[in-house]
Design a protein with these regions (language model features):
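N-terminal pre-P-loop "Q-motif" helix
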Residues: 6-27, 42, 131
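SF2 helicase catalytic motif II
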Residues: 146-165
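Short hydrophobic/aromatic beta-strand immediately N-terminal to the Walker A/P-loop
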Residues: 29-32, 60
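Walker A (P-loop) phosphate-binding loop of P-loop NTPases
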Residues: 36
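Motif I (Walker A/P-loop) of helicase-class P-loop NTPases
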Residues: 40-48, 73, 163
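Conserved P-loop NTPase motor core of helicases/translocases
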Residues: 1-4, 48, 56-152
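GG-anchored amphipathic helix commonly corresponding to the ABC/SMC/Rad50 NBD signature/C-loop
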Residues: 18-24, 134-138, 162, 169
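A structural signal for short coil/turn segments at secondary-structure junctions
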Residues: 26, 54-55
Length: 169
């Protein structure tokens, strides 16, 4: 793990073993738990912390709903505030009308969103891209989204069918 084992366990004592196994997974890893158990607020944040500690690593964070992507963005905002990071760490894709007003500044201009090349250019300047699966899917055939990321995390994956995710690969 990039950070000292003791520091990692201090930050995430209840799930440090699960996160370590997810981080080391070769292809995919499933974290399942009932609502409110910290899958987004703790597990996803821990994986983001690990990825951000690795220079140049790019992360794709996906969710089924706009509300879930708002929660991911709020987690990232809190993480950036604590870490004292600059504002260009992540980009939010999707419809601005369905995004929390406080997060709309993280989105590319709507006129550029329909242009997959513009989306690729916007996303190449950040380390983290957050999107719903449906907002991301139209751009995948143009430039193969997953070829540009080192790790993808899908929140609330049980709400998605395989047919929603598999075309992205």
């Amino acid at each position: 793990l990039p950070m000292a084992e003791r520091e990692f366990q201090r930050r995430y004592p209840s799930i440090s073993d699960v996160i370590a196994r997810a981080w080391r997974a070769k292809d995919w890893f499933l974290i399942w738990g009932p609502p409110g158990t910290g899958k987004t607020s703790t597990a996803m944040r821990a994986l983001v912390d690990l990825a951000m500690a690795k220079p140049g690593m790019r992360i794709l964070l996906l969710a089924y709903t706009y509300r879930a992507t708002d929660e991911i963005c709020k987690m990232l905002e809190a993480r950036m505030k604590v870490a004292g990071q600059e504002n260009d760490v992540y980009l939010r894709l999707g419809n601005p009308l369905k995004c929390a007003p406080t997060l709309r500044g993280r989105m590319p201009p709507m006129m550029d969103f329909d242009n997959s090349i513009a989306v690729l250019e916007y996303s190449s300047n950040v380390r983290i891209v957050v999107s719903t699966v449906s907002s991301l899917a139209p751009h995948n055939p143009v430039f193969g989204i997953f070829k540009h990321f080192d790790m993808a995390v899908v929140d609330e994956a049980s709400q998605l069918l395989d047919t929603h995710i598999l075309p992205l690969f």
